[in-house]
From Swiss-Prot:
PANTHER family for this protein: ATP-BINDING CASSETTE SUB-FAMILY C, MULTIDRUG RESISTANCE-ASSOCIATED PROTEIN 1
Gene: Abcc1
Catalytic EC class: translocase
Naturally occurring in which organism (per UniProt): Mus musculus
Name the UniProt record assigns to this protein: Multidrug resistance-associated protein 1
EC code(s) of this entry: 7.6.2.2, 7.6.2.3
Length: 1528
């Protein structure tokens, strides 16, 4: 009564009246309902949102938006609406003053509405000030207000049309005005305002339109339509991609994760410590001393907490970093889940409506509209949820990749050994992807149980306790699923381990491919890879069987639940009739149940995979980091005299291992030149590493003053232009740059590079000779203009002439660096008289230290060494005056030896070999003009081929290739089993509709109940058998395909010529063997199953709808056309985006690989931040392609679900229209199938697109499986006899060589005959073509003209392995592979242990190997990093001694060893290869002075040839080189 008196003065107006609103053919709301509920609903909505929204806006300030016409209009309309509401209020007061009694509601409602309009106007301005361009809150408010007003408007129009109707002119007029203004506000809210002032998007040339899109555009993903149209018209390119939103960039995302991880690590380390007793501090002890007195150590009794340090939780860190944004997805998911159950409830109402012939028609249309609206709301909620999940996943991946990269720059060398390059690449590719995938599913952990509980609740309402039978079936399945999840985790760990090992091995193979080819070891390593792959495939096969059982249980569970529930329902009580309402509402609920039951195991599997990845990532991120603070760095401005001070320092490579350097103490004054000498493995390089803080300092104190530059023993070259390699992030200073180029003898090289210093010099410098690479490395250091220079034997890779030039111009007392502090590790003795201090290393300790003269006077080990190995002509007495003390100018010593060293991996003598350095350094001055000319060239010459994206539709041949890889029988068997499964599913549901239409007999039971139930069960069993069959077939077929495609790729890559590896960045190949192969292994079989399932489900649903309502044939074809068009529209762009994403992924890995190889150089130059920035840019470039692809997915899904919702609408509408001619069973069947079709359509396009985007992996594997191949390895017809070559006679006949078709000749018309057993030296300036000659001999590069004849056999006519097994090389780069030492010597296990030990003894390694705990089984690290360069060179000598072929080639083989070891090696070669033909490329001429002949090469031509003594008499090139080396 109170409410009635509130609504009307006489109390006659109720709030609700069923007869007015429902039981009528012309429904309406009561006046009270209109004035209260319909007026208050929008007010309550806005006031309930206001507190949270105000808080959100106060925390998210995006900038200030200037007042625009749009904003002014919205504000003005807000005020007008307020005025209208208050006009109504004042009118009511006026009426009261006139004695007209009005209901209180006419005072309350306008007041409430007026205040709400003021709030709306306030929010419009607040949003503008906070930079909100389009508001969802406000648009929803105006929409709700309009819908409520629409109901009132309809009522007013109806009442106005009635005869004798009372019209309230003022209130009706204000209402019509109110309605119009609300409509205009709604329309205006659909548009977006301009960007805030100073917004980053204003300056961005290609900003993402999302940030400026309207709310409607954002929820429907309309803002990406422009890109979709562009992609449909022509293939998308990287230039078409938008910039990332600021909040998605690495710059924003990575630091937050890294900082949170650091905090978590600090927390986990903090443990309560209680000091029971601590001795008083000794005041005499120096402050900050790191030495703890032994007695003190004993006295300090510390009782620690008994708990160990807990592991830091990476999950907690990820949640803290990304949780707040991700939590929004909870709301959308909850809304979607609740809306999902509206479908079955409305279906129930529709079936009731069809059964009730008396119900008015408008109710049927109302239910249909309700079904459509609920489906549309469900669509919008679901895809906002997915969007948040995918964006969260993307951010997690970006953060993980960034964190891994940053960590890789910090970890210790010991940690580097425990995490190989392959493992770290997997962390960035596979593991980061696992987190990304999990972000999509993680909400299902709470959502799936919620859906199951709600479904069971509604089923209970429909079928009663019979539902417990279905629950029992589900409970029975739980332990089975749990067991499978545990097994999946086990297999996942095993799979990842095998994959890591395979990627690690492939990395090594790709890094050492040249050595494999020279030794003809490809087959041995192919077998190694295949054995790992076999293990991987075994695990995959077990996983596939598990997946088949899983699919069987997951797909069958909903049917078994339905069958058991229906069976119990009809059998427990004969009067329980399974009518259409019970059956199809239950079936709709069972269909809802199907999804959480299917998805839960997948979620569990995804969580299992992610937990494995989480652990791997946590272990990596928890690795020990280098402690740069262990070395004290001081400013150059600090007044102390010494540049480097080391006091009693002990260093080790890994904690817990014996120290490598012991008790090191020395001081170096500013500007001094210090040489470090000693035998192989004595700790010279380790000393430099210790100064760079690359080693673990056990004790002692080290101080460095100023910045440091470092030139490593193995030159590290970036895949960039020559100029960028030298500048290394510093700005270009033209004059200084030219001076550095001249000093480092690089000017002549610019003449022969296609674009001068802008020429791209390839990954790891593959188109430079060893000497050129080292000079680029040296120039980088010199250009950095640092205070301290650490040189690790840089002069060894160049010939004597260039070495002398570099020493004089750069390192020496008169060089560019004369005022800098320089530490030079060297094996040469010719420069020692000119240095200020010599440090002699022995066994990790400093054995002697002093100036050259002091060490001679001391007559110790150094003096003895000099007397033994200095050139006989050297007059030591004459050198007294030339010894340089501190600050004295020294005169270069002409005689002495220079030990050469060739450094860097994969030395490819490319263009450089077509020219050489001129003999006269004065000519280099004239080459400044060449530098300027080269710099002026606009086009940079490219060596590396970037990973290219294919365009257009994926070729049918790619699908056909995949089908062939699976096997045609398995392919067609799978399709047949899919068909059987879906036919039996359709039949069982149609059978159910017939069952529900069975009329009950007189006693209230159904006559054919048992028969119907038996057939229904039989059809279910048939369905289950088909499911198990196709799951098994697809899984096994997928493994067949994986095996075949990997084998083809591996087979082809190993048979590719060297030119292929020079052009192709290793990142591209690693990407194929890791990410693309993982897609083929794991993704494609799953996608095939889901695609086939979706396709048949859609076809089945359409058939059922057409059977039930044939009139639907009118609407299905047009909707089908819309669907097809949208799908093609999408796939065109999606496919290209996937390709662009794949292509942009390779540079991330390439850059990462490059960084790991040069990490010590990057750290030495303190360039970590620049490299991190470059990595972030590459990751962002990759995400720029990924982000539009996930949005395109949502764009498609929203549009497709709208098509699906239209099918639901028309199926229900036609059922309502035809209700008098349709049975309830058919209506139920038709509408329940139409409810599913939305999901089916969505999945079908998603899966067809996933199919096409994932099959791109097959296309990319195929791309590298069909590249050019080198000549056959074995040719039976022309194979030489086993005794060949018998004498070792080598004949070059008019031989010419070029590296590629488009390049000039590097060897020109060589005509030389070398008799069997001859010892021939090959000499020439750096880049003269010496190594090119050996490449031609091994057919690494095929001849352009002419031929090489060995013992009468033209080598071009025989197989490559026939040739390469019969000749041996000790190459420039001593490459070792991870594995046992024995495997590195004899990968085919052809020789006995005795023979291997003999080879090691002759190579002077027996003592070293015998001292190792595992002897021959000693495990070599990746790249042989746990051996010194000299030891690696000796291992290569041992390989040659094992093979003992008739022809031996030494390519500067003793470069990295000390003079004493070199002498032993030379005598070994002379005695062991006495009857062999030996070709030696030498920079150190004294090693070939006793050879029978010397060939002098210059610019690819033979300039001189004859005995060394003859050539010296000729006074030509050889004479000038010998003079430079101090031999004449």
């Amino acid at each position: 009564m109170a409410l009635r008196s509130f609504c009307s003065a006489d109390g006659s107006d109720p709030l609700w009246d069923w007869n007015v609103t429902w039981h009528t053919s012309n429904p309406d709301f009561t006046k009270c309902f209109q004035n209260t509920v319909l007026t208050w609903v929008p007010c309550f909505y806005l006031w309930s949102c206001f507190p949270l929204y105000f808080f959100y806006l106060s925390r998210h300030d995006r900038g200030y938006i200037q007042m625009t016409h749009l904003n002014k209009t919205k504000t003005a309309l807000g005020f007008f609406l307020w005025i209208i509401c208050w006009a109504d209020l004042f009118y009511s007061f006026w009426e009261r003053s006139q004695g007209v009694l009005r209901a209180p509601v006419l005072l309350v409602s306008p007041t409430l509405l007026g205040i709400t309009m003021l709030l709306a106007t306030f929010l419009i301005q607040l949003e503008r000030r906070k930079g909100v361009q389009s508001s969802g809150i406000m648009l929803t408010f105006w929409l709700v207000a309009l819908l409520c007003a629409l109901a009132i408007l309809r009522s007013k129009i109806i009442s106005a049309l009635k005869k004798d109707a009372h019209v309230d002119v003022f209130r009706d007029s204000t209402f019509y005005l109110y309605f119009t203004l609300v409509l205009v506000q709604l329309v205006l809210s659909c548009f977006s305002d301009c960007s805030p002032l100073f917004s980053e998007t204003v300056h961005d040339r290609n900003p993402c339109p999302e940030s400026s899109a309207s709310f409607l555009s954002r929820i429907t993903f309309w803002w990406i339509t422009g890109m979709m149209v562009h992609g449909y018209r022509q293939p998308l390119e990287s230039s078409d991609l938008w910039s990332l939103n600021k909040e998605d960039t690495s710059e924003e995302v990575v630091p937050v994760l890294v900082n949170n991880w650091k905090k978590e690590c600090d927390k986990s380390r903090k443990q309560p410590v209680r000091i029971v007793y601590a001795p008083p501090k000794d005041p005499s002890k120096p402050k900050g001393s790191s030495q703890l007195d032994v007695n003190e150590e004993v006295e300090a009794l510390i009782v620690k907490s008994p708990h160990k340090d807990r592991e830091p939780s990476l999950f907690k860190v990820l949640y803290k970093t990304f949780g707040p944004y991700f939590l929004m997805s909870f709301l959308y998911k909850a809304l979607h889940d609740l809306m999902m159950f509206a479908g079955p409830k409305i279906l129930e109402l529709i079936i009731n409506f069809v059964n009730d012939r008396e119900a008015p028609d408008w109710q049927g249309y109302f239910y249909t509209a309700l079904l459509f609206v609920s489906a549309c709301l469900q669509t919008l909620a679901l895809h906002q949820y997915f969007h948040i999940c995918f964006v969260s996943g993307m951010r997690i991946k970006t953060a993980v990749v960034g964190a891994v990269y940053r960590k890789a720059l910090l970890i210790t060398n010991a940690a580097r050994k425990s995490s190989t390059v392959g493992e770290i690449v997997n962390l960035m590719s596979v593991d980061a992807q696992r987190f990304m995938d999990l972000a999509t599913y993680i909400n299902m952990i709470w959502s799936a149980p919620l859906q199951v509980i709600l479904a069971l609740y509604f089923l209970w309402l429909s079928l009663g306790p019979s539902v417990l039978a279905g629950v029992a079936v589900m409970i029975l399945m739980v332990p089975l699923n749990a067991v499978m999840a545990m097994k999946t985790k086990t297999y996942q760990v095993a799979h990842m381990k095998s994959k890591d090992n395979r990627i690690k091995l492939m990395n090594e193979i790709l890094n050492g491919i040249k050595v494999l080819k020279l030794y003809a070891w490809e087959l041995a390593f192919q077998d190694k890879v295949m054995s790992i792959r076999q293990e991987e495939l075994k695990v995959l096969k077990k996983s596939a069987y598990l997946a088949a059982v899983g699919t069987f249980t997951w797909v069958c569970t909903p049917f078994l639940v339905a069958l058991s529930t229906f069976a119990v329902f009809v059998t427990v009580d004969e009067r329980n009739i399974l009518d259409a309402k019970k059956a199809f509402v239950s079936l709709a609920l069972f269909n809802i149940l199907r999804f959480p039951l299917n998805i839960l195991p997948m979620v569990i599997s995804s969580i299992v995979q992610a937990s494995v990845s989480l652990k791997r990532l946590r272990i990596f991120l928890s690795h020990e980091e280098l402690e740069p603070d262990s070395i004290e760095r001081r400013s150059i401005k600090s007044g102390e005299g010494n540049s480097i001070t080391v006091k009693n320092a002990t260093f080790t490579w890994a904690r817990g291992e014996p120290p490598t350097l012991n008790g090191i103490t020395f001081s170096i004054p500013e500007g001094a030149l210090v040489a470090v000498v000693g035998q192989v493995g004595c700790g010279k390089s380790s000393l430099l590493s210790a100064l760079l803080a690359e080693m673990d300092k056990v004790e002692g104190h080290v101080t460095l003053k100023g910045s440091v530059a470092y030139v490593p023993q193995q030159a590290w070259i970036q895949n960039d232009s020559l100029r960028e390699n030298i500048l290394f992030g510093h700005p270009l200073q033209e004059n200084y740059y030219k001076a550095v180029m001249e000093a480092c003898a690089l000017l002549p090289d610019l003449e022969i590079l296609p674009s001068g210093d802008r020429t791209e010099i390839g990954e790891k410098g593959v188109n430079l000779s060893g000497g050129q690479k080292q000079r680029v490395s040296l120039a980088r250091a010199v250009y950095s203009n640092s205070d301290i220079y650490l040189f690790d034997d840089p002069l060894s890779a160049v010939d004597a002439h260039v070495g002398k030039h570099i020493f004089e111009k750069v390192v020496g007392p008169m060089g560019l660096l004369k005022n800098k502090t320089r530490i030079l590790v060297t094996h040469g003795i010719s420069y020692l008289p000119q240095v200020d201090v010599i440090i002699v290393m022995s066994g990790g300790k400093i054995s002697e230290m002093g100036s050259y003269q002091e060490l001679l006077d001391r007559d110790g080990a150094f003096a003895e060494f000099l007397r033994t190995y200095a050139n006989a002509e050297q007059d030591l007495a004459s050198e007294d005056d030339s010894v340089s003390g501190s600050g004295k100018e020294s005169k270069p010593v002409e005689n002495g030896m220079l030990v050469t060293d060739t450094v860097g991996k994969h030395l490819q003598r490319h263009l450089s070999n077509s020219s050489s350095h001129s003999g006269d350094t004065s000519q280099q001055h004239s080459s400044i003009a060449e530098l300027q000319k080269a710099g002026a060239k606009e086009e940079t010459w490219k060596l590396m081929e970037a990973d290219k994206a294919q365009t257009g539709q994926v070729q049918l041949s790619v699908y056909w290739n995949y089908m062939k890889a699976i096997g045609l029988f398995i392919t067609f068997l799978s399709i047949f089993l899919f068909l059987c499964n879906h036919v039996s599913a359709l039949a069982s549901n149609y059978w159910l509709s017939l069952w529900t239409d069975d009329p009950p007999v007189v006693n209230g039971t159904q006559a054919n109940r048992n028969f119907r139930l038996s057939v229904y069960g039989a059809l279910g069993i048939l369905q289950g058998a088909a499911i198990f069959g196709y799951s098994m077939a697809v899984s096994i077929g997928g493994i067949f395909a994986s095996r075949r495609l990997h084998l083809d790729l591996l087979y082809n890559v190993l048979r590719s010529p060297m030119s292929f590896f020079e052009r192709t960045p290793s990142g591209n190949l690693v990407n194929r063997f890791s990410k693309e192969l993982d897609t083929v292994d794991s993704m494609i079989p799953q996608v095939i199953k889901m695609f086939m399932g979706s396709l048949f489900s859609v076809i089945g649903a359409v058939i059922i709808i057409l059977l039930a309502t044939p009139i639907a044939a009118v609407i299905i074809p047009p909707l089908g056309l819309v669907y097809f068009f949208v799908q093609r529209f999408y796939v065109a762009s999606s496919r290209q985006l996937k390709r662009l994403e794949s292509v942009s992924r390779s540079p991330v890995y390439s850059h990462f690989n490059e960084t790991l190889l040069g990490v010590s150089v990057i750290r030495a130059f303190e360039e970590q931040e620049r490299f991190i920035h470059q990595s972030d840019l590459k990751v962002d470039e990759n995400q720029k392609a990924y982000y539009p692809s996930i949005v395109a997915n949502r764009w498609l899904a929203v549009r497709l679900e709208c098509v699906g919702n239209c099918i639901v609408l028309f199926a229900a509408l036609f059922a309502v229209i035809s209700r008098h001619s349709l049975s309830a069973g058919l209506v139920g069947l038709s509408v329940s199938y139409s409810l599913q079709i939305t999901a089916y359509l969505n999945w079908l396009v998603r899966m067809s697109s996933e199919m096409e985007t994932n099959i791109v992996a097959v296309e990319r594997l195929k791309e590298y499986s069909e590249t050019e191949k080198e000549a056959p390895w074995q040719i039976q017809e022309t194979a030489p006899p086993s005794t060949w070559p018998h004498s070792g006679r080598v004949e070059f006949r008019d031989y010419c060589l070029r590296y590629r078709e488009d390049l000039d000749l590097v060897l020109k018309h060589i005509n030389v005959t070398i008799e069997g057993g001859e010892k021939v030296g090959i000499v020439g300036r750096t880049g003269a073509g010496k190594s090119s000659l050996t490449l031609g001999l091994f057919r690494i590069n095929e001849s352009a003209e002419g031929e090489i004849i060995i013992d009468g056999v033209n080598i071009a006519k025989i197989g490559l392995h026939n040739l390469r097994f019969k000749i041996t090389i000790i190459p420039q780069d001593p490459v070792l592979f991870s594995g046992s030492l024995r495997m590195n010597l004899d990968p085919f296990s052809q020789y006995s242990d005795e023979e291997v030990w003999m080879a090691l003894e002759l190579a002077h390694l027996k003592g070293f190997v015998s001292a190792l705990p595992d002897k021959l089984n000693h495990e070599c690290a990746e790249g042989g990093e746990n051996l010194s360069v000299g030891q690696r060179q000796l291992v290569c000598l041992a390989r040659a001694l094992l093979r003992k072929t008739k022809i031996l080639v030494l390519d500067e083989a003793t470069a990295a060893v000390d003079l004493e070891t070199d002498n032993l090696i030379q005598s070994t070669i002379r005695t062991q290869f006495e009857d062999c033909t030996v070709l030696t490329i030498a920079h150190r001429l004294n090693t070939i002075m006793d050879y029978t002949r010397v060939i002098v090469l210059d610019k690819g031509e033979v300039r001189e040839c004859g005995a060394p003594s003859e050539l010296l008499q000729q006074r030509g090139i050889f004479y000038s080189m010998a003079k430079d080396a101090g031999l004449v």
